[in-house]
């Protein structure tokens, strides 16, 4: 038996990302369309010139070969509500193309874009405040088209498997994930309260691609600091644990994942980020740290932090692509945990008779993006993230030996 379930993409087009829709009319293409009849779009009581503010409604129709069961796993068989917001007609063309090209791809799922009515949309602002996000966004490219869903298998999977269906810089955010991605095929725990999102970009120079994750990590730290400064809140001690983790008070609160494919002389890169914002489990979260630092509530909203991240990342990426990572190195070292850190490196001796212990001091990063360390005799060691097991808090690095 085949069942059909529906979820939605709502395309909201406005130069400020917000509108007061005063009427709904039927458009010529059968889609429901709402427009602003006033001369301004209202954003938190501030008027701004209206430039073609239009809302269009789309549905994603999901086909499944089996009806979901009544147990918990049934939630993994559905796509839930998906809403996309943008602020230019360019992104609308991509959504229109999805209709013609038979929708999006997801593992074990057929997704087809069809037209439905606005009544399928309920109070999605209770989950993610699109207007708050758009009002804080200041980028030219990244995050201008945002896809949101209360529940997805993985934001990373959605974008990576549909990379060319959306413009570069498209972002996808979910309230929860049940197949979140981590490094080396690890699963990332994705409870409610964790800020989970992915976005896309393209690069031509593969030699600097390993350094991109450091630019992303730096942007995460700077975004947290910017939001706290804006709120006049104390800044928590959040730092980068090499190569791609975000730590606070010795506990992991976030991580970065970058994957890429190569085609037509370009790398198609999908970047995923998970950050504990409101969930104190399994470790701690940013808002809990803020509450410990002050008696006044300065809670960070994920919409604000997401917009701040894209703002910082766009600036840092431009510097990285034009001037190289060396221009950002001092900033990066200021935010990581490892400058001058002394660790015990366990490796095999030259006769391969067994492990040999060498004390090394972390010096920084190599031009290839690997960890650079030296021993007491000034011998240099280049440590690869996928070839070593790092326990920096115990001061130990173990070589991953082939069995």
Specify the residue positions occupied by each region the protein language model found.
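Glycine-centered tight beta-turn/hairpin loop motif at sheet-sheet or coil-to-beta transitions
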Residues: 251, 353-355, 376-378
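A short macromolecule-binding patch
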Residues: 378-391
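SH3/SH3-like beta-barrel fold
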Residues: 371-375
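Conserved, helical-rich catalytic subdomain that frames metal- and/or nucleotide-binding sites
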Residues: 293-358, 363, 392-403
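Conserved beta-strand residues within beta-sheet cores
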Residues: 175, 243, 250-255, 340-342, ...
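N-terminal lobe of the biotin/lipoate ligase/transferase fold
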Residues: 1-230, 396-403
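Nucleotide and nucleotide-moiety/phosphate-recognizing core
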Residues: 163-165, 187-304
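Short, conserved beta-turn/loop elements at beta-strand boundaries and strand-helix junctions
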Residues: 365-370
């Amino acid at each position: 038996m085949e069942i059909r379930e529906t979820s939605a993409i709502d395309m909201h087009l406005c130069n400020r990302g917000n509108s007061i829709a005063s009427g709904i009319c039927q458009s010529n293409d059968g889609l429901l369309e709402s427009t602003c009849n006033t001369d301004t779009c209202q954003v938190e009581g501030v008027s701004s010139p209206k430039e073609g503010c239009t809302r269009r409604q789309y549905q994603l129709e999901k086909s499944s070969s089996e009806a979901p069961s009544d147990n918990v796993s049934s939630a993994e068989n559905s796509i839930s509500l998906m809403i996309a917001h943008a602020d230019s007609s360019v992104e609308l063309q991509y959504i229109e193309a999805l209709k013609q090209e038979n929708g999006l791809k997801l593992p074990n799922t057929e997704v087809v874009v069809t037209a439905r009515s606005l009544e399928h949309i309920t109070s999605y602002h209770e989950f993610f405040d699109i207007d708050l996000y758009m009002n804080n966004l200041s980028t030219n490219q990244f995050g201008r088209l945002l896809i949101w869903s209360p529940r997805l298998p993985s934001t990373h999977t959605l974008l990576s498997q549909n990379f060319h269906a959306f413009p570069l810089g498209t972002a996808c955010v979910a309230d929860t994930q049940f197949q979140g991605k981590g490094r080396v095929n690890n699963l990332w725990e994705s409870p409610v309260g964790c800020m989970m999102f992915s976005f896309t970009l393209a690069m031509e120079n593969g030699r600097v691609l390993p350094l991109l994750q450091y630019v992303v990590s730096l942007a995460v730290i700077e975004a947290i600091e910017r939001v706290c400064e804006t709120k006049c809140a104390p800044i928590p001690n959040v730092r980068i644990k090499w190569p791609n983790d975000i730590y606070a008070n010795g506990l992991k609160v976030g991580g970065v994942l970058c994957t890429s494919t190569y085609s037509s002389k370009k790398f198609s890169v999908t970047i995923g980020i998970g950050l504990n914002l409101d969930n104190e489990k399994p470790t701690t979260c940013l808002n809990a740290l803020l509450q410990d630092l002050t008696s006044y509530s300065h809670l960070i909203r994920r919409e604000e932090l997401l917009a701040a991240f894209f703002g910082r990342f766009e600036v840092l990426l431009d510097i990285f692509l034009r001037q190289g990572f060396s221009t950002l190195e001092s900033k990066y070292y200021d935010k990581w945990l490892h400058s001058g850190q002394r660790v015990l490196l366990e490796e095999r001796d030259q006769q391969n008779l067994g492990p040999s212990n060498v004390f090394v001091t972390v010096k920084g990063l190599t031009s290839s993006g690997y960890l650079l360390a030296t021993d007491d005799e000034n011998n240099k060691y280049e440590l690869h993230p996928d070839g070593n097991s790092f326990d920096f808090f115990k001061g130990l690095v173990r070589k991953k030996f082939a069995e």
